[in-house]
Regions:
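ATP-binding/phosphotransfer module of carbohydrate and carboxylate kinases, centering on a glycine-rich
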Residues: 1-61, 70-74, 94-99, 114-130, ...
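Conserved NAD(P)H cofactor-binding loop of Rossmann-fold oxidoreductase domains
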Residues: 67
């Protein structure tokens, strides 16, 4: 298994990339960032990705996150980026543009991989749910270290409202929720989601957790609850780690070797 890889994290406002040490789950050198042409053509996004990749890394594979469902390297949904991405391959044209092996993965799944193999959920067996709280709500579900990809639990509907409409960053702004009101909604979503999956651990990450480091203390759920450990680097680290895994097969034994 290769010891380093490039992680590329595509967002609505920026594309971030860095070299990742796969034995530690840490960045090597600086994290580069370029503006994201999120609503532009596919070709412009690919060019921006190439601008974000550190120079002198041509021999390293790359993992690329995408804010939507990704199956077999192809995009099937798109959030905060142009809808023209839907139905478009990502891994193949990115590999051609970057001249290297590329693995494409849902952005929340990448953050989950980082937390399970290097962060707050490392070494935890059973069912682990990683929720990314940002503009929307992303999710990654793991069973005994194996990822169940593209769960999109932010679209679960409770009492006529999607989870994202209750407890995302966008919902908090649009509904003018104060902190207590937001905690009430988030607590509701977490407990209803827990009732469906009965996770042993829930990990919360994303921008909202960065703004409120004591968030976990304000929530009450019937399982262990932690904040993510990798914070803003989770997407990059998880994308890079995805290059060590077979396409569509998430093997815990390989993950443990990388996590030593």
């Amino acid at each position: 298994m290769h010891r380093q890889a490039i992680g590329i994290d595509i967002g609505g406002s920026s594309i971030k990339a860095a070299v990742v040490d796969l034995s530690r789950g840490s960045l090597v050198g600086e994290r580069r960032s370029v503006p994201s042409p999120a609503m532009s053509a596919v070709s412009e996004m690919l060019h921006a990705m190439s601008e974000a990749v550190p120079e002198g890394t041509e021999n390293l594979p790359a993992g690329v996150t995408f804010p939507g469902v990704v199956v077999g390297g192809t995009v099937y949904t798109a959030a905060n980026v142009a809808k023209s991405w839907i139905g478009q391959p990502l891994a193949e044209p990115a590999a051609a543009k970057l001249k290297r092996k590329v693995v494409a993965i849902n952005d929340a799944d990448a953050a989950g991989l980082a937390e399970v193999h290097f962060g707050a959920a490392r070494g935890v067996m059973g069912t682990v749910l990683v929720l990314s709280l940002g503009t929307g709500i992303g999710s990654a579900l793991f069973v005994d270290g194996l990822l169940v990809p593209n769960t999109e639990l932010g679209h679960l509907e409770f009492d006529g409202m999607e989870a994202e409409a209750r407890a995302s960053g966008r919902a908090r702004l649009e509904r003018k929720l104060d902190w207590d009101g937001y905690i009430t909604e988030l607590n509701y979503v977490l407990n209803r989601t827990h009732a469906l999956f009965w996770p042993d651990l829930i990990v919360l990450c994303g921008g909202i957790t960065g703004d409120h480091p004591n968030l976990a203390d304000d929530l009450k759920v019937p399982c262990q609850l932690k904040l993510g450990a990798l914070r803003a680097d989770a997407g990059i680290v998880g994308a890079a780690f995805a290059t060590t895994l077979h396409e569509g097969v998430w093997i815990d034994k390989q993950a443990k070797v990388a996590g030593k």
